[in-house]
Amino acid sequence: MEPQADIALIGLAVMGRNLILNMNDHGYTVVAYNRTLSRVDDFMADEAKGTQVIGARSIPEMIAHLKRPRRVMMLVKAGHPVDEFIEKLMPHLAPGDIIIDGGNSLYQDTIRRSKYVESRGLLYRAEE
């Protein structure tokens, strides 16, 4: 499979779905992923039908669709879920790839995560 997507977005609640569609409308190819796979299926069959959005059913599949440097945005519940996804993503990413936390994380958590992720050669950006 030839990587073709510009960014991946994890989290298909209302904000995630709408951000994916907005990026698609502006010419970006986005990979959509959610830990509840039925949300991916429903999104792809409904709002994303007929778009350039790519649905992924696993993290390795999601990463395989991305052009380098790979960009993964998370819109997941603040706290432990962010840490869980960082741990799930890191084995599949390489130095220079970017993890973006678009959620509402506590700034102390953002500082801790940034140091951790960047110590492994990845970039970490978050809303503050």
Where are these regions (language model features)?
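Rossmann-fold NAD(P)-binding glycine/threonine-rich loop
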Residues: E87, A94-I98, G102-E128
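The beta1-alpha1 cofactor-binding region of Rossmann-like NAD(H)/NADP(H)-dependent oxidoreductases
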Residues: L37, I59, G79, Y107-D109
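Short, well-ordered coil/turn residues at beta-beta hairpins
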Residues: H65, L75-V76, G102
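NAD(P)+-binding Rossmann beta1-loop-alpha1 motif at the extreme N-terminus of oxidoreductases
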Residues: M1-R68, H92, G96, R125-E127
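Short glycine/serine/threonine-rich phosphate/pyrophosphate-binding segments
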Residues: R17-N18, P81-E84, Y107-I111
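Glycine/threonine-rich flexible loop motifs
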Residues: R71-K88
